[in-house]
Amino acid sequence: MEIAPGIRRLGAGLVNVYLLEESGAVTIIDAGAPGYWKDLHAELAAMGRTPDDVRALLLTHAHSDHVGFAEQIRRESGVPVLVHPDDAALARGEVGQVRDEHGPGYRSWSIRAIAGFAFFALTHGMTRVTPIAEVGTLLDGATLDVPGAPRVVHLPGHTSGSVAFHVPARDAVFVGDAFATRNVITGRRGPHLATTFNEDNRRAIASLARLDGLAAGIVLPGHGDAWSKGLEEAVRLVRDSIPDELRA
């Protein structure tokens, strides 16, 4: 579905994949779940495109719910997959995911939200995500020579190699899991710090400063609906959401 001019989304907001189109060519941002593979082909067809029109797959980070179909499109269509160097080993499956000890207490968990995410994972192939055999790298501050010309903003915390992609031409920023507008564990909506799956919550909080001053009217998270009230307001709300025990 088109959510802004030149930007389309796969998924219903639980786990997001974005397609960024420019002059008939496409950049994919994140690869969601393996089960999105058929959805990807359908969305490209709706655009009048095929996998041959995809120039690159960019990962905001290398957690399994963002790696999804990456190896399949790399292997079958030769699409290069790019990730920050600090997440390259994770993308290749050489190391496992790490979680910070600070997360929402059990009282804030939502059985309904957890059940919904578990059902999604089971029905979209999340139990069999294939590591990426070969990845390229993208560096902080680089403007990438791919459709949309996204600029890389390193935001370590959720993972060491987490990044955002700022696309001034679309007045948009893709923030990955630097923050969410839908929490798959608690069910919370709106911009907030989703602490459960962060590698280092304090580092994630510090990284928010790297978003200050970026001009973007639309914010596109890895989980949840697009936020159309601007990045500045989104970051303000995220800071307001920080748990007291992480403010010291």
Residue ranges, per PLM feature:
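Conserved beta-strand hairpin/beta-sheet module of binuclear metal-dependent hydrolase folds
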Residues: 1-47, 51, 165-180
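Metallo-beta-lactamase
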Residues: 33-35, 88-156, 160-231, ...
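Short, structured coil segments at secondary-structure junctions
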Residues: 3, 76-77, 215
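C-terminal regulatory/interaction regions
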Residues: 232-236, 240-248
